[in-house]
Structure formats: structure tokens, C-alpha cells
Regions:
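Active-site-adjacent structural elements that line small-molecule/cofactor binding pockets in enzymes
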Residues: 1-339
Length: 339
């Protein structure tokens, strides 16, 4: 298992320093997300400033960009980083596609699968000089003259991860992708009984095995130096869990544990804007299954014990103010990595 770091400072003026520090502390990958900022720009800044740490998107929203645009961006970052990019893509939900990005939302699973295949076809054209002939249900690409072709690079095999919650996405990830970004709203039971079987089905269809595939996620952790601090941070985690559990997309996680009844109740309260009451509906059992609690001296070992064999790359999800020293971070990396 490898401990990664989710970027929390998106000011491009400080990205290089942040990335170098993450690399020096031993983190395996620096992940960006597409929430308030572009996910690719920080990686372009971090690439020439570092030499070992991997650089990834967790995730970039796939459909607002043409696969051609994504292909160019990923190709350039892969070249600048000497092969350290992990391209993470996700479909997002209907509301964000249609109302935040103003793009059509249709058949998200098959369409995301086609994005992956289109990217590979475009990159093969650039790397090998083969004609670009991609024809799918949603995308078609057949024009690539030398003037627009960036040409081959030293590390052309860019790993693609997709975000998945439901069975189709997990199976599709196993069939055509290199890894799966598991949503932070997860449990070990959900991973073991729902996610892994679906991915394995896809891997078998592609003729590959588990060793060819990577599971990555951010894990909710409740960390504090004393009981009072941990209790306050636990409440912040409850609130975030309630937010995710109110979204119907994540129903498979609830169903795995027999918690289906709480989903509609949370959704109703979210429509009413009753956020405080939502957190109170998250039971201690749910909190214990979804989050890992402890101190920085033992949380890494607890993560490793719970998710050994289920996850390959993890980062900490802490929706509260974090105070951690460089020494604690370096030790945490060793705990998770088994050092």
C-alpha cells in the first residue's frame, strides 16, 4: 500500500514548493481534483519541479472536455514529468454536467468507456504514426495531420483510472482501464463484496489479473491529539458522510450494509437545507465503518490493517482543520507503506 497526498493548495504560485515538499516527505502521488480549480494546471507546474512523485487527477470531469483536448493536455504533462502522470477521469453526476458545465449527460458509463478508448486511439496515432480512425457512438476522430500531431514521447503509456461507484463503472474499469478511483464514501465491506467482484469480472474479460490493476481512494480519518479534538473532528466527518449518503448515486454503499432507509431521509433533509440534522443521522456504526480513527502515531497502521489487499493507494480525507508536522507526515508514510 502507498500513501498519497491530495493537493489542498491550488495557488499556482505555491504549487512547485508544495509538490517538492510532498516528494521529500515520501508521498507516492500528488492528486488534484476538479472542484474549485482546474485539475491539470497544478500538475503542469509540479512536473518540472519534481522528479519522483507521481502526479494524478482524482478526478478530472470527462465530458465537458473533448477527448482530443484531454489527450493533448495529458500528453504534455506526461512528457514534462518523464512518465509520472496518472490520468483519473470521472463522469460526475447529471446536475453538474448539465447545470455547472452545460453539457449533455447521456449514458455516462458507456460514454466514459468510449472516452478511454478514444484517448488510447489518439495517443497511438501520435506515438506510432498510424492513421487516426476512431468511430464510436458518442465520439468520432479521423483528422490528424502532421501540423497538429505532437509526435512521440519517451513514456507513451499513460495509465488511466476512472471513478466508479456502481457495478457498470467498476466492471468497465477492470475491462479497459489501469485503475479505479473508489469514492471516499466507502467501506471495507463494500470494497470486498461489491467493488472487487465487479472489477474482477472486467479484468477477466480483458484477459488481465489483479496485479495489472490499481485501487486508489481517499479514506475518511478521524485524527486528534486528545478525545475532545477527536470528537470535534468526528462531527465534521459525520457531516461530510451525511452529504454523500444523501446522494442517490452512492446508494450501493448503503445497500451493502443494509442502511438503505437512511438515504431517502438524508436526501429529504438536504432539499430542506437541514444540514445539521443530517449529520446527527449518521450513527456510530456508520462512522466506524466508513472512517478510521486514531492518532498520527497509529492511523497509518490502522489504515493498512483495514484495507490490506483491498486498496493499493490511499490518501487521507480530513474535512476539518489539520495540524501535522513534517516528522509526523514522514512517519505516516512509513506506517502505510509498511516501512
Amino acid at each position: 500500500m502507498i500513501l498519497d497526498l491530495a493537493m489542498h493548495d491550488y495557488d499556482l504560485r505555491g504549487v512547485a514548493q508544495f509538490a517538492r515538499r510532498a516528494e521529500s516527505l515520501g508521498y507516492g502521488c500528488l492528486w488534484t481534483s476538479e472542484t474549485q480549480h482546474d485539475p491539470f494546471l497544478p500538475l503542469a507546474v509540479a512536473a518540472p519541479a519534481t522528479s519522483k512523485i507521481k502526479l494524478g487527477t482524482a478526478i478530472a470531469v470527462a465530458f465537458p472536455r473533448s477527448p482530443m483536448i484531454t489527450a493533448y493536455t495529458a500528453w504534455d504533462i506526461q512528457k514534462a514529468s518523464a512518465g509520472r502522470l496518472i490520468l483519473g477521469l470521472g463522469s460526475q453526476v447529471r446536475a453538474h454536467n448539465e447545470r455547472r458545465f452545460s453539457v449533455k449527460f447521456e449514458s455516462p458509463g458507456p460514454k466514459l468507456r468510449e472516452v478511454v478508448l478514444a484517448l488510447r486511439a489518439i495517443w497511438e496515432c501520435w506515438q506510432k504514426g498510424t492513421p487516426l480512425r476512431f468511430k464510436g457512438q458518442f465520439y468520432s476522430f479521423d483528422l490528424m495531420t502532421p501540423f497538429f500531431n505532437p509526435g512521440p514521447i519517451d513514456h507513451p503509456n499513460i495509465p488511466i483510472f476512472v471513478a466508479g461507484v456502481n457495478q457498470y463503472m467498476c466492471r468497465m474499469a477492470g475491462e479497459v482501464c489501469d485503475g479505479l478511483h473508489v469514492h471516499p464514501f466507502n467501506t471495507a465491506k463494500y470494497l470486498r463484496e461489491f467493488v472487487h467482484p465487479a472489477v474482477e469480472e472486467g479484468l477477466r474479460a480483458s484477459g488481465r489479473t489483479r496485479q495489472h490493476f490499481t485501487y486508489a481512494t481517499s479514506v475518511f480519518v478521524v485524527v486528534g491529539e486528545n478525545e475532545r479534538e477527536r470528537a470535534a473532528n468526528a462531527e465534521a466527518v459525520r457531516q461530510q458522510i451525511a452529504f454523500y449518503a444523501s446522494t442517490r448515486t452512492y446508494a450501493p454503499v448503503l445497500a451493502t450494509h443494509g442502511w438503505e432507509a437512511i438515504g431517502p431521509e438524508l436526501h429529504k433533509k438536504s432539499l430542506q437545507g437541514d444540514w445539521q440534522a443530517m449529520g446527527q443521522l449518521i450513527t456510530d456504526e456508520m462512522l466506524d465503518e466508513i472512517a478510521v480513527a486514531g492518532t498520527y502515531e497509529n492511523i497509518g497502521r490502522k489504515l493498512r490493517e483495514r484495507y490490506a489487499g483491498l486498496l493499493d493507494r490511499v490518501s487521507l480525507y480530513q474535512p476539518y482543520e489539520v495540524a501535522i508536522t513534517d516528522a509526523q507526515q514522514a512517519d505516516l508514510v512509513k506506517q502505510v507503506n509498511g516501512g
